[in-house]
Amino acid sequence: SNTCWGISNAYASPAGIDKGANTTQPEKRGNGTCARLDTRIETVKVLGCIDIEVCIAGTLFLGKVIEPAKNVNDPYSIISMGIPFSQKPKAIMLDLKAKVNPERKVLRATGFSKKKWFEGHDEPEVYVYLQKRWEDEKGNIYAKRIGTVRQRFDKSIPEWKNNYRIDIHYGDITNEPYFKSY
């Protein structure tokens, strides 16, 4: 495609079972279009008798998904994330709204074990990691994080927030007052 954006609508084929997910999709907004990201349970019936249920979250990122996904245990192994930057961005800006479940329960459903609820809170988040990457003469690839954006939303945002800005912080931010350990 002719875009820098990647989405999690991947075609997967774990254990020889073919399945497509559509948790990120276009949605009309005013005169344009935005990306709607959903989290939901996808079900696959195998040979008419085995139900496999997987919890899938919508994502939007810079990069692409390497398809088909053969292994759900390491999703980052099938994602090529990132695009080169030559300048020092100050922030990420977006229009957003969110529907966040107020319950303090999280569902784990991988498709290969029973669904399990545990204590926690499923929260949408925005994150950006700016890295300097290089390869040595032996082919080893290295990355050093130089900039970070990370924000979670623990409550619903029912109305659109336009031009929402999240600053990019450079250097070691672990001792800064705005640092969050998540």
Q: For each predicted feature, which ranges?
A:
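Extracellular carbohydrate recognition and processing domains
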Residues: 131-179
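Residues within well-ordered beta-strands of beta-sheet-rich folds
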Residues: 91-97, 107, 127-129, 165-169
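Short coil-to-beta strand junction motifs in C2/discoidin
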Residues: 107-126
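Signal that preferentially marks extracellular ectodomain short beta-strand elements
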Residues: 45-48, 74-83, 164-178
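Extracellular glycan-recognition surfaces and repeat-rich motifs
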Residues: 1-46
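Extended extracellular/luminal ectodomain segments enriched in beta-structured repeat modules
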Residues: 84-93, 98, 102-104, 121
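Extracellular/lumenal carbohydrate-interaction signature centered on repeated Trp-anchored short motifs
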Residues: 52-92, 156-157
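Short glycine-rich beta-strand segments
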Residues: 40, 95-103, 126-135
